[in-house]
Design a protein with these regions (language model features):
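Catalytic-loop region of hydrolases
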Residues: 2-7, 14-30, 37, 41-195, ...
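Alpha/beta-hydrolase fold active-site neighborhood
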Residues: 63-65, 322-470, 513-515
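A catalytic-pocket lid/entrance helix-loop region that shapes and gates access to the active site
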Residues: 179-192, 258-323, 356-358, 373-389
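Conserved acidic catalytic loop of the alpha/beta-hydrolase fold
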Residues: 211-218, 229-243
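Alpha/beta-hydrolase fold nucleophile elbow
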Residues: 241-251
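Conserved strand-to-loop "acid loop" that flanks and positions the catalytic carboxylate
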Residues: 473-479
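Conserved alpha/beta-hydrolase "acid-adjacent" motif
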Residues: 481-486
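Catalytic histidine-centered segment of alpha/beta-hydrolase-like enzymes
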Residues: 507-518
Length: 556
């Protein structure tokens, strides 16, 4: 995720992507989302438009939820206060906002309630209105209230036929808040180069869990993906929609899959971008993704080598990687000092790998340049030289290493730890870290490290498993270092009626409306327009983003 003016810092491992994008471990400079025009593939057939829904259906009646499904939403200004520039931007874009009341505990619908913030950019082509599409930007813990204007642009002509609805999941963003009071913005650090770093991490992660327990004792048990899916269904009912369409990125693909399993028959068109197979969803989210991250780093190193005159990191891939290794080794000997008074940061070997990890989820030139600038600053610090920070790098470090945006990290941990249990014994993590070092010395100690879930109460519900087919559209890049292509393909196999759009040779997390690939955008928009999945799985090239896709045999 990258920093941005609209979404704030909502990402899990870095500043939040523009428009509230909060994608799972995706940190990169904000993109000026240029959507390339593409022709609608001929493999689609038109479907009849759906009229605007009238009253909410009676789904939920008999289980105490009827009053939530039938609530009247008070749509109005999105501005929450005098400093709410994002709210003013939404108002200017024609977006309206409201709060949806949901039960804290769905087992006790007459008990305590909380609110979930929603935003809506209404369809302007009312004669051909299709319905409403609900957005989730991942994270977990990412916001989406600020996303409808951007998604409307990505959807092109079909966007005018939808009510585009963003929401901030329970305890996220503009919804009923939870702030654990963390001293850092994320829990996802490396174990470092030795036992001392790991022991510091054990103490930190226990402290983070304890802080959340102290701040949110009455709500933590009710923060989970399954409860967010239940909130989504209340939103659907409150909007008056019999079925709702859905666009989810990263973790949002897991949330979307959970919704299809919990509420079959209540969804229409579902797009899952950068998908997570339910079996891959675990407390250590990135465990097993070390090869993809190392390939992404290696590809970035080759790119940086071609720009040695600009960044001075090495003239070959091997030289750039040696520079990176030297930085990590120096940080293990003692923290690296970057920045200048009054803003100075000291980064050790539990933090430097995080910076590298955050920078490789986007292979655009802009993102790669930003990472090169960050590595250049770290290289200077490793040599004991002054290492001034760019505004973007300073913002990223403030997010990760201070409490400036601590609420984001705390809620993300609450969602993950509320979903899935984790080993309690720190030695389990240490053994995994040590086993990973030989093959993956840089990222193994990060992806296998302990986190707050080791000290969390056990989840109230079991993880959701796929037991029903769902005709969804999955979008994935072969080199995605966050939600790996293996996971997207795995979800595709679990859902025989799904179709998979593959972007080859891209180290990119998050494609639709973000990557400028006209093939991807065209396929997704055709599906949203017609409700018809492509007849076959499709492959899109990165060589000419605005060109048509090439077809491949279905892997169903």
């Amino acid at each position: 995720m990258a920093h941005g003016q609209h979404g704030g810092k909502s990402g899990p491992l870095g500043a939040g992507r523009r428009r509230g994008r909060g994608r799972w471990y995706a940190v990169a400079p904000a993109l000026a989302a240029t959507v390339v025009a593409a022709c609608v593939p001929a493999a689609y057939a038109a479907a009849p438009p759906a009229p605007a829904a009238a009253a909410a259906p009676a789904q939920g009646a008999g289980d105490g939820l009827d009053r939530y499904h039938r609530q009247r939403l008070a749509w109005g200004s999105c501005v929450k206060g005098p400093d709410d520039t994002a709210g003013r931007d939404l108002d200017r874009a024609g977006v309206s906002c409201a709060d949806v009341t949901v039960p804290l505990d769905y087992a006790d619908p007459r008990g305590r309630t909380i609110t979930v913030a929603v935003s809506r950019l209404k369809a302007t082509d009312t004669r051909r209105r299709i319905g409403a599409v609900l957005l989730n930007n991942g994270g977990p813990g990412g916001t989406a209230v600020e996303s409808p204007p951007h998604i409307r642009k990505a959807m092109k002509q079909v966007g005018t036929r939808y009510d585009i609805v963003g929401f901030d999941p329970r305890f996220v963003g503009r919804s009923t808040p939870l702030d654990c009071g963390w001293p850092v913005g994320t829990a996802w650090f490396s174990a470092g180069s030795g036992r001392a770093g790991f022991d510091r991490q054990v103490a930190l992660q226990k402290d983070l869990a304890d802080k959340c327990r102290a701040a949110g004792a009455s709500v933590l048990a009710h923060i989970s993906t399954r409860n967010t899916a239940r909130d989504m269904d209340v939103i659907r009912g409150a909007l008056g929609e019999r079925k709702i369409s859905y666009l989810g990125y990263s973790y949002g693909t897991y949330l979307g899959t959970v919704y299809t399993q919990m509420f079959p028959g209540r969804y229409d068109r579902v797009v899952l971008d950068g998908a997570v197979a339910p079996g891959d969803y675990k407390a250590r989210l990135m465990q097993g993704a070390e090869p993809e991250n190392e390939r992404a780093l290696s590809d970035w190193a080759a790119w940086a080598a071609g720009r040695h005159d600009a960044h001075g990191l090495g003239r070959t891939r091997a030289e750039v990687l040696a520079t990176v290794e030297g930085i990590v080794a120096a940080s293990a000997r003692g923290p690296l000092t970057v920045g200048a008074a009054p803003e100075v940061f000291r980064l050790d070997d539990t933090q430097v790998p995080l910076i590298l990890f955050m920078g490789i989820a986007d292979d655009t030139d802009k993102a790669r340049t930003a990472l090169a600038e960050q590595v250049s600053a770290l290289a200077k610090a490793a040599q004991g030289r002054p290492a001034p920070l760019s505004p973007d790098f300073a913002q990223l470090l403030r997010y990760a290493l201070t409490g400036e945006q601590a609420a984001t990290g705390g809620v993300q941990a609450a969602i993950i730890c509320g979903d899935v249990g984790a080993p309690r014994d720190p030695e389990v993590y240490w053994r995994d870290i040590e086993r990973s070092r030989a093959a993956h010395p840089l990222f193994g100690p990060l992806t296998n490290n302990i986190n707050p879930c080791a000290f969390w109460d056990r989840p109230r519900e079991e993880l959701t498993r796929v037991r029903r087919d769902a005709a969804v559209l999955i979008v994935a890049a072969t080199g995605d270092p966050r939600t790996t292509y293996r996971s997207s393909a795995g979800l595709h196999e679990l859902l025989p009626s799904s179709k998979l759009i593959t972007v080859e040779n891209a180290n990119r997390h998050g494609l639709y409306g973000e990557y400028g690939n006209g093939c991807v955008d065209g396929e997704v928009n055709a599906y949203l327009a017609t409700g018809k999945l492509p007849k076959e799985d499709r492959t899109c090239s990165t060589a000419s983003p605005s060109s048509s896709s090439s077809s491949s045999s279905s892997s169903d």
